[in-house]
Amino acid sequence: IPGAIYSEDRENNVLFAEAFITTPYVFVMQKAPDSEQTLKKGMKVAIPYYYELHSQLKEMYPEVEWIQVDNASAAFHKVKEGELDALVATQLNSRYMIDHYYPNELYHFLIPGVPNASLSFAFPRGEPELKDIINKALNAIPPSEVLRLTEKWIKMPNVTIDTWDLYSEQFYIVTT
């Protein structure tokens, strides 16, 4: 069962369980001696197409060039390489990616004035029973346990393979 960021637009395609955690949105940028926690005119900033706050950010930062991407994870590498100046991600995703893959290269800072992302499980629209079962299970988990599990996920040990090289391009396996 995939976890997903809730949005009204996505609700037309899938069912969402109740949100099990919320997390702030952040900007992710290259770490530099003169790193500032602001966006500047002309910057190229990636935002996943499914983030609802896209139009709100365009109003808040009209001088920025917004580039929609399929997901935030692939955009981290583009920020590191300088192809993008920044990206919008959730704090949980950003903290994990920076700690494990870009510890001395990227940093993040909170985006002021925007609502938090609500993370929940997503289901095919034809599976309302499964959604109800998951909702009951989630409601039985104390909030302190959800926090503990989230912290455990963030502090996973470093992996030694370069997943960017593995997953940076689509590939297909054809069998006959």
Predicted feature residues:
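Proline/Glycine/Serine-rich low-complexity intrinsically disordered segments
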Residues: 1-176
